Every structure is written in C-alpha cells, then in structure tokens.
Design a protein with these regions (language model features):
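Short glycine/acidic-enriched loop and turn motifs that connect beta-strands
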Residues: 3-9, 62-68, 123-128
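Entry beta-strands of beta-propeller and related beta-repeat scaffolds
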Residues: 1, 53-58, 114-119, 177
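Beta-propeller blade signature
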Residues: 12-24, 70-86, 130-138
Length: 177
C-alpha cells in the first residue's frame, strides 16, 4: 500500500509491504519512508516476485520536485527479507538506465534469473523504449544494487519513435504479460 507525500517529508511512510497468512490475518509489515516519493504507484503498475526468502517489488512513483520545477515519474525497486519483514534494499533515486532507472516508466515487470533480477519497463523518455534490465549483482545477499560502480545490463527490446507533438508520454505501445 502507499501514502501520498505532497510535502516531501522524508520521515513519512510512502510504501508499506504487509504479510498475511492464508486466512488474511496480518502477520507483519515493513515500510519505506520518504523515498523521493510524492505519489506512490503513480501512472504505472506494481508487480512482485519472490525467490527463497526474498520478495522483490517493481513499481513506480511520482518523485520529489526536481530542479526544473516538475515532479517527474519513474520506476521503483524494493527488496524485502520475508522472514524478518525488513527492507534490505531499494532504489527510488534519479540516475539513468545503467542503474535500472527508467523515467517515465508506465508499466513495470520483475522476475528472477537465478540470483539476478530481470525487469522490463515501458519508458517514454529515459529511455524511450521497452527496456529489459538485468541486475548483475546477487540479490540473495540482500542487495540487488550494492554500489554506484556496479551497473546493470540493459537492452532496448523495442525503441519508440520520437514524438515531437508535445510531451513524450505517447508511445503508441502497450506491454502485457
């Protein structure tokens, strides 16, 4: 679940992941605070996968106001240790696709390949493509993105043509699965 954060408060919980038993009794939850997020789940989807004790979430958010005065949208990745229900890693910052960042990301998918995260995002600008991203680090360590120096592998599966009639949002494409 999520909570809007229009005042850009770094101590406000904006994403909450809750664990339930098979009878829908709440067991435990964990949260992500601030996280460069004003509107969680904005203009995209929320998908999850798990492997062993690790829950991996790929979703999106509207971010804190940037230097151009706008609140841009991008993807979000969160890793949770399920037995302890603690967030072990997350990425909500601004970077480029070499770090798994896609903006705007209108649809997000996540799977695992062995001990690596594989994700697909529908980007309209950075990059303007359906981009497949593979994280090169071993997420079972609790860190899918351990350092600034460890980039991801990425490939544009489909590149969308330039759109000059206004904002980049229109791509003429839909990704399903």
């Amino acid at each position: 679940s999520g909570q809007e954060n229009p005042k850009q408060n770094d101590s406000l919980e904006v994403f909450r992941i809750t664990k339930y038993d098979k009878n829908w009794n709440k067991i435990k939850s964990c949260g992500l605070y601030g996280a460069n997020t004003t509107v969680p789940f904005d203009a995209g989807s929320a998908r999850m996968t798990h492997s062993g004790d690790h829950l991996l979430v790929r979703t999106c958010h509207e971010m804190y106001k940037s230097s151009d005065g706008n609140n841009h949208q991008a993807n979000v990745t969160i890793e949770v240790d399920m037995p302890s229900m603690t967030i072990t890693d997350s990425y909500t910052g601004i970077m480029n696709v070499d770090y798994g960042y896609v903006s705007h990301s209108f649809n997000q998918f996540i799977k695992t390949d062995g001990n690596h995260i594989v994700a697909l995002d529908h980007g309209d600008a950075h990059p303007r493509s359906a981009v497949l991203v593979k994280y090169n680090s071993d997420f079972t360590t609790g860190k899918f993105f351990p350092s600034y120096f460890e980039q991801v592998s990425n490939i544009d599966v489909v590149t969308y043509p330039e759109y000059t009639a206004g904002h980049y949002n229109y791509t003429g494409a839909a990704i399903g699965g």
